[in-house]
Amino acid sequence: MGWEYAQVHLKYTIPFGVVLAAVYRPLMSRLDVFKLVFLITVAVVSTIPWDSYLIKNRIWTYPPGVVVGLTAWDIPAEELFFFVIQTFNTSLLYMILSKPTFHPIYLSKKTGWGKIAGQILFASAIIFGLVSVSSGGEGMYMGLILIWACPFLLFLWSISYQFIVNLPWTNTALPIALPTLYLWVVDTFALRRGTWSITSGTKYGVVLWDGLEIEEAVFFLLTNTLIVFGLIACDNNLAILDTFPEHFPRTKGVPSLLTIIRTLILPKEKYDEERIQGLVSAVALLRKKSRSFYLASGTFEGRLRIDLIRLYAFCRAADDLVDEAPSVDDSRASIEKLRKFLDLAYEENQEEPSQRLREYVTSSIPEMFHMALLQLPTYYLPKQPLDDLLKGFDTDLLFDRKSGAFPIETTEDLDIYGSRVAGTVAELCNHLILYHTPEAVPEDIQREVVASGQEMGIALQYVNIARDIKTDAEIDRVYLPLSWLKEAQLTPEDVIQQPHGPTIEALRHKLLDRAFEKYNMAKGAIDKLPSEGKGPIRVAVESYMEIGRVLREKGPTMKKGRATVPKMRRIRVAWSALNK
């Protein structure tokens, strides 16, 4: 009896797992737990017969003095735990690295030659392994590794090829390479100390470096590849399930085994390419226009994340359609076209856009905005907030420097404006969270959450205005209430001419004070949201309010005339928000 093998876990594998678990804990969802338990179960069940064979046939040996003595199927308890901890660690690393990834945009109907090439590679490895095992001798251990691992890899490659090759390398190569290199180092220490060993005559005798047998290097590379490919296959299936509701009606929570099988056999010809391209466009817009929302979106999951991105894409498209029009009259015409679009969409009340609605959009709206409008989930969103959003756009068009028209006269006017352009969006986000949650939320709590969301939206808009005083002045707009300017002995023209200085800073801080007042009043309702939305919404809110905190500090980081939050600070804010 000995503790040497156990010390390998205590020194190397468990601490690594504890760190990864601590990092990912705030992001862990029920779906993540399901994937983790499923992968660990498959890893343990599939490895036990193989490892038991190695030990019984003395291909792989352990000196009696290095293990505690507890065994199952001749496998030491420490070795069984290795199956668990390796899968746990590699899975968590993959989840951390892939959390920001929006998987639906990597779905594709195309099947390139790479799929066949990969299948040939893994099939050839299986054949080579079979020949090596049947021949015995020095290729025995390598052959056993290949005939055990490569059939699984062949299957996973066949069902998830497009994801494996299309996902960013940080989702594929990196979560394989990092734990593999780490375990190569750990294995080198163990082999040198004799904690375990490969029997001579069953190995090639080739080393990757001094102390690391080539068979061990291949084993850890293939096992980590198996784990990552398995997780990619899970994400591939979930992306299919979430992206195509016409094939998979509304689902909540962990999908059933039957549903997963149905996603596997769905022909790629039935993928809705228009929907995929619409999501690609929406994500590109999100990355470009709002880093705060993009960071927060990664903490949502499934159809909720898809619909939030679709909602944001519509809001950005509508804003650009109005703001980028060549004249005020064209902007007003764009608003009327958007009203007509909403009237038609809600009049028909269909989950998918009708031919009539498509024809209207394609004939009236510039092509670059088609996807954003047609993918708005109007079927389960209320119409009033969207109508109010357009009223906010109407207010923007009332600004006229030449005639001296500045529509924000009082604090109440600013509250109304903030409610229309930001409170409405927060309200719609909460409606989506409540729609997609599997939890039953009492109606009184729903009303409270929606109302508080409106107030929080106003708070965020105050931050936005405080940040953009100079930017707005450049387009002849002053959102500071005229009553505030009068108290400060300023006119809108003064702000446009000189949007900086002590007086402007005092007004900026007044905006921020009101923003944080509303924020403090509304933030308690976040805790009443369903678990799927609580943490992510807090991240979205705190990420944006951090801009306000930066503005309150001296020497904010500026980019294109705006205060920005440094990347590492944004990450710390998100981490803190998720841990509340």
UniProtKB/Swiss-Prot annotation:
Primary role: Bifunctional enzyme; part of the car gene cluster that mediates the biosynthesis of neurosporaxanthin, a carboxylic apocarotenoid acting as an essential protective pigments and leading to orange pigmentation. CarAR catalyzes the first step of the pathway by converting geranylgeranyl diphosphate to phytoene, as well as the later cyclization step that transforms the carB product lycopene into gamma-carotene. CarAR also converts part of gamma-carotene into beta-carotene. Neurosporaxanthin is synthesized from geranyl-geranyl pyrophosphate (GGPP) through several enzymatic activities.
Protein name as catalogued: Bifunctional lycopene cyclase/phytoene synthase
Glycan attachment sites: 89
Organism whose genome encodes this protein: Gibberella fujikuroi (strain CBS 195.34 / IMI 58289 / NRRL A-6831) (Bakanae and foot rot disease fungus)
Keywords, comma-separated and alphabetical: Carotenoid biosynthesis, Glycoprotein, Isomerase, Membrane, Multifunctional enzyme, Transferase, Transmembrane, Transmembrane helix
GO-annotated molecular function: geranylgeranyl diphosphate synthase activity; intramolecular lyase activity; lycopene beta cyclase activity; squalene synthase [NAD(P)H] activity
Entry keyword annotation includes Signal: no
Induction cue: The expression is subject to photoinduction.
Membrane topology: Multi-pass membrane protein
Gene3D superfamilies according to UniProt: Farnesyl Diphosphate Synthase
This protein's record includes keyword Cell wall biogenesis/degradation: no
Catalytic activity: all-trans-lycopene = gamma-carotene; gamma-carotene = all-trans-beta-carotene; 2 (2E,6E,10E)-geranylgeranyl diphosphate = 15-cis-phytoene + 2 diphosphate
CDD domains: Trans_IPPS_HH (cd00683)
GO CC, alphabetical: membrane
